[in-house]
């Protein structure tokens, strides 16, 4: 029955729908709905209609079209239009940064809006490039894939709307979150020529990973739209949508299952840990942040780069696409300094494992490792500053920002402790270590959906695939650095946030490997969503009682928090057991 709704494997032969037939209409309808919804939501966000038209044209003609042509020339067509356009948009964002850098270095920002023209002309005039205007070797995806991706993108759009609906466009009375104003100042500065200065301090050189702000500045200069409108409204959803398409393509490539794409796209960016009413949240629940454009923007080049590195470790030739590796590495380093180190660690682990197993130097992997290492070093010299300059080693420092520790043992630690461990742990003795262990265990448990993919390392067949080690090593490195480093503003959490999509792709791959019927996978997801709604107390008569805090921030005790953490973990384990039983029951009947 599942086969009637969705093809199981992406490489299975599928009848190509007629370009004007019912299949084509049904496949295109969800994309029309997504675009219409996006325009509607933008308009409800007080964006004028002329700005909507200009920004839409900018994305189509200055990013998607030239990027798709270049990506097809370097990597080939993916056999279907949506994925081609998604990968093309990601490549277009890369090309835009290069064009912006050239314009800023030469003071020719007025010519920036024309950068796509030479690309489009070249692909129209050169005979052997003209074939990249169309999808080659068509491998159409099932109608259900299109509707699944449409649903995922609509959820992304809804998330974007919830982020900006309470943030009015200027001029207004009131204040903005300080990070938003900081990025707005950077966007204004990046419309000027190099060398850049810190917009808040005259004469101070700008040291920051600012390439996300360069994208927003480019969009403003090319369209003529106010930087505030682009930053506060327009840039976010298209970039997240592009990242969602990349995650979907990566999941489909790795698993060979068509359904893995929409599942990964939705879970990677909108999925959050289900804490089931616990007063202790899971720091770093989502990879997206409205207040941190750098974190959200970097997911696009990071996922595009991850796809290339997967081919490298699997021994596939990149051919003309090899230059993308160092360039994307530098873009990642310049967009968010925490994005590249976990991927480098995962690549290093993969190289060591397969050198040990085969006693052969994996030269392509070492070349890629050298490229990324050089990109990170250059990025540190060109961009690093701000938070990167205040990061230091302190194991378990994340505890400073989690209530059970910060309200008890951590009250006397201060904002910038210099000890190798939070002082409260040692001062608390055995009880201090027990509390630290309980908090870390709860964090790992709450992040469980991002860990499931690690099970592939126990699968003898999959363990031989270098891609498993690459993704698993990347996720582990992101978690480890989050708990090893300390930052006064909890910026170490970005190491984890950056690898969440990687962990979800790995989890989706493992679920596809299990070959469970799709309803068995839907049941736990629906159960998690309902549990989240119920424990939030938003459904009258259905809300599950929330777990109470053990007193106020000044009166809570270690023993009280240990009871709360134990109850939270018990509730979570029971929930997983019930959801698993339901999934097994559905699978048995399907």
Regions found by a protein language model. Name each.
Residues 1-143, 566-578, 582:
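Membrane-embedded, hydrophobic transmembrane alpha-helices
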Residues 22-32, 74-92, 143-149, 257-264, ...:
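Membrane-interfacial loop-to-transmembrane alpha-helix junctions, especially the N-terminal start
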Residues 28-46, 144-173, 240-244, 269-272, ...:
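Transmembrane signal-anchor helices characteristic of membrane glycosylation enzymes that use polyprenol
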Residues 65-82, 101-105, 131-133, 237-238, ...:
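Transmembrane alpha-helical segments of multipass membrane enzymes and assembly factors
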Residues 153-296, 300-301:
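Active-site lumenal/periplasmic loops and adjacent helix-entry segments of GT-C-fold
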Residues 293, 325, 349, 354, ...:
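Transmembrane helical bundles and short interhelical boundary loops of multi-pass, membrane-embedded
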Residues 321-337:
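Membrane-interface alpha helices of multi-pass inner-membrane proteins
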């Amino acid at each position: 029955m599942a086969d009637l709704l969705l093809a199981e494997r992406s490489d299975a032969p599928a009848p190509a729908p007629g370009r004007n037939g019912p299949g084509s209409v049904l496949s295109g309808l969800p994309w029309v709905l997504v675009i219409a919804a996006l325009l509607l939501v933008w308009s409800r966000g007080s964006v004028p209609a002329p700005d909507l038209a200009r920004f839409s044209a900018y994305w189509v003609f200055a990013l998607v079209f030239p990027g798709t042509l270049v990506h097809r020339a370097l990597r080939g067509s993916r056999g279907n239009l949506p994925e081609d356009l998604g990968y093309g948009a990601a490549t277009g964002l890369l090309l835009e940064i290069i064009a912006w850098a050239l314009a800023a270095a030469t003071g020719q920002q007025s010519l920036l809006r024309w950068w796509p023209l030479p690309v489009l002309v070249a692909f129209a005039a050169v005979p052997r490039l003209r074939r990249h205007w169309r999808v080659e070797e068509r491998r159409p995806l099932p109608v259900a894939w299109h509707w699944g991706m449409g649903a995922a993108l609509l959820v992304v759009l809804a998330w974007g709307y919830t982020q900006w609906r309470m943030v009015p466009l200027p001029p207004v009375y009131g204040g903005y979150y300080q990070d938003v104003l900081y990025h707005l100042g950077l966007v204004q500065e990046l419309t000027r020529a190099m060398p850049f200065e810190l917009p808040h301090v005259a004469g101070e050189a700008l040291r920051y990973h600012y390439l996300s702000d360069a994208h927003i500045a480019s969009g403003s200069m090319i369209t003529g739209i106010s930087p505030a409108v682009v930053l506060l409204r327009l840039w976010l959803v298209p970039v997240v949508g592009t990242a969602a398409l990349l995650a979907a393509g990566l999941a489909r490539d790795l698993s060979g299952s068509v359904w893995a794409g929409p599942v990964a796209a939705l879970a990677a960016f909108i999925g959050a840990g289900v804490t089931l009413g616990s007063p202790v949240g899971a720091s770093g629940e989502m990879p997206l942040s409205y207040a941190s454009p750098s974190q959200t923007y970097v997911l696009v080049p990071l996922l595009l780069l991850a796809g290339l590195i997967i081919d490298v470790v699997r021994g596939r030739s990149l051919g003309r696409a090899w230059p993308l590796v160092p360039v994307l590495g530098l873009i990642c380093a310049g967009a968010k300094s925490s994005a590249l180190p976990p991927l480098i660690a995962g690549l290093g682990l993969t190289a060591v494992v397969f050198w040990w197993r085969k006693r052969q130097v994996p030269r392509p992997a070492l070349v890629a490792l050298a490229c990324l290492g050089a990109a990170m070093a250059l990025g540190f010299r060109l961009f690093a500053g701000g938070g990167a300059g205040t990061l230091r080693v302190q194991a378990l420092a994340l505890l400073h920002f989690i209530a059970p520790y910060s309200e008890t043992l951590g009250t006397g630690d201060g904002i910038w402790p210099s000890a190798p461990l939070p002082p409260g742990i040692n001062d608390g003795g055995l009880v201090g270590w027990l509390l630290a262990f309980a908090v870390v265990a709860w964090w790992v448990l709450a992040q469980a959906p991002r860990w499931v993919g690690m099970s592939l390392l126990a699968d003898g067949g999959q363990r031989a695939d270098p891609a498993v080690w690459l993704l698993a090593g990347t996720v582990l490195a992101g978690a480890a650095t989050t708990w090893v480093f300390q930052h006064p503003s909890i910026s170490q959490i970005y190491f984890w946030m950056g690898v969440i999509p990687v962990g979800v792709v790995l989890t989706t791959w493992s679920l596809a490997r299990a070959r469970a019927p799709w309803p068995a996978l839907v049941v736990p997801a629906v159960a998690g969503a309902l549990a989240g709604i119920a424990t939030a107390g938003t459904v009258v008569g259905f809300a599950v009682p929330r777990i109470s805090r053990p007193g106020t921030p000044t009166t809570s005790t270690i023993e009280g928090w240990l009871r709360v953490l134990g109850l939270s973990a018990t509730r979570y384990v029971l929930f997983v057991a019930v959801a698993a039983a339901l999934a097994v029951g559905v699978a048995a009947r399907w």
